[in-house]
Amino acid sequence: MTTMSRRYTPNIIITGTPGCGKSSHSSSLVSQLNQTLGKETTIHFKHFNISEIAKERDCIESYDAKLDTSIVDEDKLLDSLEPDLEKGGVVVDWHCCDIFPERLIDLVVVLRTDNSNLFDRLKTRNYNDLKLQENLDCEIMEVILQEAKDSYIPDIVIELRSDTAEEMDENVDRISSWVETWIEDHPDGVSNELNKQYNPDDSSDEGDDNSDSDEYELEEDEQEEEEEREEYDEETNEEMEHTEDIAQ
């Protein structure tokens, strides 16, 4: 069976409207995980603030003057991030989550904030009126939550409140516990690949002399695909069980 790339620590997206506490959650989570898990192992989690990463890796496409914000080249960004995600242990901190492949994401945390709190937080950032109102509307309409549910298996998407420092501490503790359980339950890691289906149109006819060999190879491919499907289903079921625990 062909060896497939695997990751041994989960990738987590912490997303939500600007001002909901993504960076604070992500920084605290990574610090806690590295303190608790890194003492006796080589495990090391990384906080990827995508707004900063996009600038560092030259993934800014343009600038929107009305909203006073940079426009990211998402294709270039994803190409840059994919090798990091395949290694695992990445906590992605960004207001957008739908560009990341489902096969590389294990948990999506959508932070929600009361609009009065959000207004105050964005005001302290000196957001202009248009940008402030757009973000408030985004929170009211649950745009990012719906985006997450549309982009990933619903069972790995959780919604957490982020109005107080106490709630942030509770959220970080819950996510940390989920990570520890995930690592314990995946000693052999998880695959970074999706199941590949055999497509007869991709094969070429090289003559009757190779027909027996081709048939044997196809049987082997089918067996490998079935094993990969079973493995993927098992990993998906485990993810669903773990996410139910953290959402409770």
Curated annotation (Swiss-Prot):
Lineage top rank: taxon? Eukaryota
According to the UniProt record, where is the region LID? 124-134
* Cellular localization per UniProt: Cytoplasm; Nucleus
Up-regulation conditions: Induced in the presence of exogenous hemoglobin and during the exponential growth phase and by cold-stress.
Catalytic activity, per the record?
Answer: AMP + ATP = 2 ADP; ATP + H2O = ADP + phosphate + H(+)
Molecular functions (GO terms): adenylate kinase activity; ATP binding; ATP hydrolysis activity
What residues does ATP bind to?
Answer: G19, G21, K22, S23, S24, R125
Region of interest: NMPbind: 49-72
Per UniProt, the ranges with Basic and acidic residues bias are 239-248
Please give one Pfam family short name.
AAA_18
According to its UniProt record, the EC number is 2.7.4.3
Where is the segment annotated Disordered? 188-248
GO CC, sorted alphabetically, is: cytoplasm; nucleus
Acidic residues: compositionally biased ranges: 202-238
GO annotation terms (biological process): cellular response to oxidative stress; maturation of SSU-rRNA from tricistronic rRNA transcript (SSU-rRNA, 5.8S rRNA, LSU-rRNA); phenotypic switching; regulation of gene expression
Query: Could you tell me the keywords of this UniProt record?
Result: ATP-binding, Cytoplasm, Kinase, Nucleotide-binding, Nucleus, Ribosome biogenesis, rRNA processing, Transferase
* Known partners and oligomeric status: Interacts with small ribosomal subunit protein uS11. Not a structural component of 43S pre-ribosomes, but transiently interacts with them by binding to uS11.
Q: Which PANTHER family match?
A: ADENYLATE KINASE ISOENZYME 6, POS9-ACTIVATING FACTOR FAP7-RELATED
Q: Give the function comment from the record.
A: Broad-specificity nucleoside monophosphate (NMP) kinase that catalyzes the reversible transfer of the terminal phosphate group between nucleoside triphosphates and monophosphates. Also has ATPase activity. Involved in the late cytoplasmic maturation steps of the 40S ribosomal particles, specifically 18S rRNA maturation. While NMP activity is not required for ribosome maturation, ATPase activity is. Associates transiently with small ribosomal subunit protein uS11. ATP hydrolysis breaks the interaction with uS11.
Q: Which family does it belong to?
A: Belongs to the adenylate kinase family. AK6 subfamily.
Q: What is this protein's name?
A: Adenylate kinase isoenzyme 6 homolog HBR1
Q: Gene name, please?
A: HBR1
